[in-house]
Regions:
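Catalytic core of nucleotidyl cyclases, primarily class III adenylyl/guanylyl cyclases
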Residues: 1-21, 38-74
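Short, structured secondary-structure boundary patches
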Residues: 16-24, 110-115
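Short amphipathic alpha-helices in soluble, non-transmembrane regions
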Residues: 24-32
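Short loop/turn segments at beta-alpha junctions that line or gate ligand-sensing/allosteric surfaces
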Residues: 27, 72, 94-95
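Short hydrophobic alpha-helical module
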Residues: 31-39
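Intrinsically disordered, glycine/charged-rich C-terminal tails and inter-domain linkers
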Residues: 34, 59, 66-67, 78-138
Length: 138
């Protein structure tokens, strides 16, 4: 949904059928960043952006194939604050990073914030390791 200059994407296991939504959010943020950078190279009108990823609880239900939700706590406010600070970067809350740290490579910015460098493709790595082990006879 949109609020002012902010666009929020809510990833909820009710819709994604995935419990690792923090990792999916980081992957999505990388794709959005790449699309914006490509736009900014091709077009005169530059898009200023910053992406913030926060993790928290929501009350959710699906009505007419649309997610209806009420955030609990400050998950939306947290994401908005991170986005405001994230000048052309992707910032993630400590809580969200800790839930996805096995696949998300990031640099700690302060006690509560991480800057995402990249998201590891575990499937690609798994295939490489399997092929390597086959070639080495193990």
């Amino acid at each position: 949904y949109e609020e002012g200059n902010f666009v929020f994407v809510v990833l909820c296991d009710l819709m994604t059928k995935n419990v690792k939504n923090e990792i999916e959010a980081a992957r999505l943020a990388e794709k959005i960043t790449a699309a914006i950078k490509e736009h900014n190279v091709k077009f005169k009108e530059i898009i200023e952006y910053g992406i913030g990823i926060s993790s928290g609880e929501i009350l959710a239900k699906v009505e007419n194939k649309k997610l209806k939700f009420t955030p609990l706590g400050n998950v939306i406010i947290g994401a908005k604050k991170l986005a405001e600070q994230a000048d052309k970067t992707i910032l993630m809350s400590k809580e969200a990073y800790e839930k996805g740290s096995a696949e998300i490579k990031a640099v700690k910015k302060d006690e509560k914030t991480y800057e995402i460098m990249n998201v590891v493709d575990q499937e690609k790595n798994k295939k490489f390791i399997e092929e390597f082990l086959k070639r080495s006879g193990k």
